[in-house]
Amino acid sequence: SDEELEEALTSLVQKIQEEDRDVEQINRRHREHDHSITLPKHFKNHVIDSAVAFIVDNYSQSVGLQEAANHLGVSESHLSRLFKEVTGLNFLQYLNAYRINKSVEAMSDPKKNIAEIATSCGFPTPGYYAKIFKRFFGRTPTQFRDILGSPQ
């Protein structure tokens, strides 16, 4: 009957509206969530703590394992092995994750474009930055920024 059909349609419309609300809540939570990769900064290991401090101080420069090892007065192979052992990440993974976190912070300034953010965070090219960013967040920096609601 028409009444039954109308009831079924009304019920369906309500379900769709509820789902829309759920999606909106998830999106809002996602937007409000702290978009950063959790990176401990203290490891109770002098060499690794010093290496992390080196990253924090120099992430915006063109630096890597070699520069960190030279700065700390240890061999690259020793630092590489120890870093992986203590942090669970290799040096470059940690450095890139730190740079990505800094880039996400920089995105909140709508005056900065993605290329500027990439170079200011120590990435050699915007393309490399986008590739690494996508590996962490599953989307490009531009797509990510659009979700955050900042103008490109």
Summary of predicted features, one role per range:
Residues 1, 15-21, 36, 40-43, ...:
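Basic, amphipathic alpha-helical hairpins
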Residues 8-15, 72, 120-121, 132:
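Generic recognition of well-ordered alpha-helical segments
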Residues 52-57, 62-66, 74, 85-124, ...:
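Terminal helix-turn-helix DNA-binding modules in bacterial transcription factors
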